[in-house]
Amino acid sequence: MGKTLLKTKKGKKVDGELIFCLLMIAVPVVQFIVFYIIVNFNSFLLAFQRFNGDMADVKYSFAGWDNFKTLWIDLTQTTNMRSAIKNSLTTWFFTSVVGITIAVIFSYFIFKKGWLASGFKLVLFLPSILPAILLVAIFQIFVDTIIPEVLNVNPLFVLGEGTAFPAALFFTVWFSFGTQVLLYCGSMAQISPSVLEAAKIDGVSPIIELWKLVIPEILPAISTFLIAGIATIFTNQANLFGFHSTYALEYEGEATLGYWMYAMTKKSEQNYPYVSTVGLCCTAIALPLTFLVKKALAKLGD
């Protein structure tokens, strides 16, 4: 197929396909520059600034390393920041390690067409197509109203202090299965039937088949979720904002680091410099860790 050539006023011919391609990539490139590079560069600058004035007249001035000193004091002398980090690591463990393990087992059960496999697939995937805030409302009504009435027990108080983080963590893990199960089942469907048939003839048990045959084949899909989990280890707010808005900050030891940063920026613009400092430090830890995990998983898959 010949190229489309446009003739300019000076008689020069311009490749029309090249112009079309440039126009198509212009929008995403501009979006990347504005909403990623510029925004993150501004966040980097805020880490070295302090808030001056009031909300009617917002001003920032250079603060040097003062925000980093404040962060060090919070880490060493207070418990709120350490509790938030602990909750973030707990969230990562249950969503990335426990959650992925359970999702792989459920996917294998569905792949082998076990008892009620189609029903499990529907139940696990259906929540992922509903808005998160709707799922939060349904979960809260179910736990605090329906279960106490049916079982004649006291409400579990999802919004209460002491149960806010465990309830949000359970919700996050439970409703994160859908996308994983769908991808794992799709990857398992690509496994050659002859390989599985040969394993069956050789008398391979389901556990060995899962460990030796299935998991190596779906490792790229598993790696994707593991890498994403590491990359968001400090920014995952575990749906706490959906349950509590910014009020969970008032509860002792209930916030994750991701929720703390999000809620602090929602509360006041005065918190921007300190939150930017925390975010910059988290990036300095998570970025190399993400690349290391990615490299390790790539070697494991070779």
Sequence positions of predicted segments:
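A structural signal for multi-pass alpha-helical bundles of membrane permease subunits
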Residues: V14-D302
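Short, Lys/Arg-rich, polar N-terminal cytosolic tail immediately upstream
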Residues: M1-D15
